[in-house]
């Protein structure tokens, strides 16, 4: 059997498939998206974890030992900042968040040599812009940041203890140079 987990904006879904690809079981659990200020969209990563555990338990119910593989999908845009202990420093800033609109103008004003390798359309909820916003508006939190993850990559860390991403998710952060297949500091150094 194979387990699929999708970390959505307001809920997590778990799906158990048999070896023949047919659905054996499915479960979903909701979690809150808070908007402490108009235009902000945040969720505490601990909520994702708690509801993922519940959804997986409900879906696998006594069949966990039969699971041969796990696939993750979910929010690629968004920002989870971790401290030295690899724990979140604040609620995650989600893809729908609009607080970094001023940072969009700043990015678009950068020299093409910095902007073009990022190879993406720009939206306020992208991790690079949210990180710029954090640097300006929550400097103590920003100073404590040791790792930056997408929501889905944070869930992978919670499940496995491993920090990882893949190029398609990394490219959506505005912190990744697609042509060089590596992290770009241009936006944060500008």
Residue ranges with predicted function:
Residues 1-90, 144:
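N-terminal glycine/serine-rich phosphate-binding loop of ATP-dependent small-molecule kinases
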Residues 57-190:
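Glycine-rich phosphate-binding/catalytic subdomain of phosphoryl-transfer
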């Amino acid at each position: 059997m194979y387990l699929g987990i999708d970390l959505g904006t307001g809920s997590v879904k778990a799906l158990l498939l048999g070896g023949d690809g047919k659905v054996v079981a499915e479960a979903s659990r909701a979690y809150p998206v808070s908007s402490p200020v108009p235009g902000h969209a945040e969720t505490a990563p601990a909520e994702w974890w708690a509801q993922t555990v519940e959804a997986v338990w409900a879906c696998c119910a006594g069949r966990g030992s039969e699971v041969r593989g796990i696939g993750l999908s979910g929010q690629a845009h968004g920002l989870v900042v971790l401290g030295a202990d690899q724990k979140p420093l604040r609620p995650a800033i989600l893809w729908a968040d609009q607080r970094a609109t001023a940072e969009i103008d700043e990015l678009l004003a950068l020299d093409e040599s910095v902007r073009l390798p990022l190879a993406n359309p720009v939206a306020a909820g992208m991790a690079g812009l949210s990180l710029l916003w954090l640097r300006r508006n929550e400097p103590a939190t920003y100073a404590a940041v040791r790792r930056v993850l997408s929501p889905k990559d944070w869930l992978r860390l919670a499940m496995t203890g491993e920090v990882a991403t893949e190029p398609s998710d990394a490219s959506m952060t505005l912190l990744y140079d697609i042509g060089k297949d590596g992290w770009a500091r241009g936006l944060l150094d500008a």
